[in-house]
Regions:
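Conserved ABC ATPase "signature" region
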Residues: 99, 103-126
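Conserved ABC ATPase signature
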Residues: 130-134
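Conserved catalytic motifs of ABC-family nucleotide-binding domains
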Residues: 151
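Catalytic Walker B motif of ABC-type/P-loop ATPase nucleotide-binding domains
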Residues: 155-158
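Helical segment within the ABC ATPase nucleotide-binding domain
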Residues: 170-182
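ABC ATPase "signature
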Residues: 215-216
């Protein structure tokens, strides 16, 4: 079976508030799908359920055809996540960070995997540097290496280039493009960077009020809504108080 992650009739409620309401989508092997929406629309809750960290009120998440709620331990070893809001242990070196994380996942040939990712992400010269002394761009690349240390088949990215300078952001995007081509991986990219989404994603999910209100390729969405670019489509989504379709 090819690698994939599928969300089926997924909902999450907190008391009387419905944070995510009956959403459906699938990310196939070797595909990056973008998730766009304003703050508070349900993106983070969706990612939490996809990772098995939040229990859905209704629906299910299938990873490679298996329900994550019923196969959580085995499936989480095939998944990983990156967010700029999760800090690295400041007193550990880069190498120590990768070793600790690799051992959590029981990674075979851990040293070889560290060497591979360090080369790809230009970490070789800072492997023995303490993480707390790194620049934001260096920390971002270390976080990405940690997220790939277990060679995941599913990768969930929450604002992976937030707060990065243009050069470092472009390096990370180029790395993700190449990594996807070289590895059989399904990727969800939640981002507010429209150029990033258009460059990396084969399709885009537009989310508002906990609902997927539209989806399609970036070019399809631009044409459908008669806009000049994806940013204008996003602004239409945010500003339109009525149904967006």
């Amino acid at each position: 079976m090819s690698n994939s992650i599928e969300v089926i009739n997924l909902s999450k409620s907190y008391k009387s508030k419905r944070a995510v309401n009956n959403i459906n989508f699938k990310i196939n092997e070797n595909e990056i799908v973008g998730l766009l929406g304003p703050n508070g629309c349900g993106k983070t809750t969706t990612i939490g359920m996809m990772l098995g960290l939040l229990k859905p009120t209704n629906g299910q998440v299938l990873v490679n055809g298996l329900d994550i709620e019923k196969n959580k331990i085995s499936l989480l070893h095939k998944m990983n996540f990156i967010s700029p809001y999760i800090e690295l242990p400041k007193k550990l070196t880069v190498r120590q960070n990768l070793i600790v994380y690799g051992k959590l996942y029981n990674v075979d040939n851990l040293n070889e995997q560290i060497d591979y990712l360090s080369s790809k992400l230009r970490l070789n010269k800072i492997l023995d540097n303490v993480t707390g002394e790194l620049s934001s761009g260096q920390k971002n690349r270390v976080s990405l290496a940690k997220a790939l240390i277990n060679n995941p088949t599913v990768l969930l990215l929450d604002e992976p280039t937030a707060s990065l300078d243009p050069e470092t952001g472009d390096f990370v995007r180029t790395f993700l493009e190449n990594y996807k081509k070289e590895n059989k991986i399904s990727v969800l990219l939640a981002s507010h960077n429209m150029d990033e989404v258009k460059r990396l994603c084969s399709s885009v999910l537009m989310m508002k009020g906990g609902v997927i209100v539209d989806s399609g390729t970036p070019d399809h969405l631009i044409r459908k809504h008669g806009r000049r670019n994806l940013e204008e489509v996003f602004l239409e989504l945010v500003r339109n108080k009525n149904e967006f379709n």
